[in-house]
Amino acid sequence: MDKKMFCYQCEQTVGCTGCTGNAGVCGKKAATAKLQDELTGALIGLARAVDGAETISKSTSQVIIEGLFTTVTNVSFDDAAIENMIQKVRAEKERLVPDCNKCQSPCGKSDEYDMQQLWNADEDIRSLKSLILFGIRGMAAYAYHANVLNYEDAEVNRFFCEALFKIGYEESMETLLPTVLKVGEINLKCMALLDKANTETYGTPEPTAVTLTVEKGPFIVVTGHDLKDLQLLLEQTEGKGINIYTHGEMLPAHAYPLLKKFSHLKGNFGTAWQNQQKEFDHLPAPILYTTNCLMPPKSSYADRVFTTEVVAFPGAVHIDEKKDFTPVIEKALELGGYKEDQTRTGINGGTKVTTGFGHAAILSHADTVVEAVKSGAIRHFFLVAGCDGAKPGRNYYTEFVKQTPSDSIVLTLACGKFRFNDLDLGEIGGLPRLMDMGQCNDAYGAIQVAVALADAFGCSVNELPLSFVLSWYEQKAVCILLTLLHLGIKNIRLGLSLPAFLSPNILNYLVENYGIAPITTPEEDIKALMNH
């Protein structure tokens, strides 16, 4: 492909075909996209160097996970940071195979991979390898967060190498398809690992009402997904007269007992990631980005953007691994916050939201739920979940939830919930009809609930009165979708648009074997799903 860049990994890619110009829709420059390709090629070279090894060292695994996470949409816009990551990958390979560069008869077995080979491959091969690549990029984010809390899984670590190796190897459709589904299988283990890490570190999430009001005085907004960063910031700001507000996917942090004990963790600011340039405009407070989703900041708040971990933006102050948040704290005190309390609302006018309905909380009411289904009080369950985004038409999910029947339960997770999480849908048998299960990785919890219900009724998950209505934007949504396919979940509705990296043949395979379908209208989809 003779283009300035090529990237089609997110839902908003140009024309649902790919970003090829001077910059992507996400805001990354063509040079940045090329560096991401170079980084991916270097990671494949590292995977080639460890091919056949019985064990993967902790340092190698950490480099691979960090490198993959760096290439996720809206994580790093900083060319220097990506170049440093490339050098880190090459240094790790040099440590493993130090004699390769000196070899007089190079075999090429540990060479870096030229990503142009992938982008110019047969469209079906390209499609399957893209599913693998984007899936392990998303999975790397979950592995990274688990690693931060000192949890890891040797099988997960080995699979990153296995998958990268296959991307750089000549494979047929027949041999790639099982690997695509294996991404889903291993991601289930990875999400289980992160669920264990979060709950054993911070406690089991509890249903918790969260205010959207911002109190007067200095405050800090924390966005992203990393609970450890939030914990450290809460500890460092305690007693300093600074309030902390979550943003986006950090909202579920309010449900964890260890984090709830901090009285200055006050509430949630704003809605989903794509609204940040409007919501952060002239914000009298700093914003700490712990992971994606970062958008190029406007000049009105660029001086108060702080990044950490793999997140990076040129000119933004980066908090290194020492985790000294003093610059963020000083900026909060300097800006001073609002002069008076600010009453803010969600998209639908609600002044509070509720989170914390993880699998443990829901399954503690399993008998009530089962009895409600048997009595007819609950006729259907909908999992309306996934990423939010800026493309027009995502109000579909708001309208869908509003129109769900009064005898149905809506489970949700990830940032797509901000389209409707401030709605009051009422209750059934003392349980709220709308239950927020947490971050995108808490799809693991939704799966646990589905499996438990299937066991209770002696049927398969596909035989339950349960429908999956998903929204996607970036690569974590890809690995979750592959997990659902690995589990044999059928008749998933997916939107807002279908992935550009699905070739017609691969899409047809998913339709024929799994019943995947694009969303249409809320009315038509609810009718079809209720009658399925």
Question: What residue spans do the PLM features occupy?
Answer:
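Electropositive, gly/pro-rich neighborhoods at or near active sites that engage anionic ligands
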Residues: 43-201
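Anaerobic metallocofactor- and corrinoid-dependent redox/one-carbon enzyme cores
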Residues: 2-32, 36-37, 41-45, 55, ...
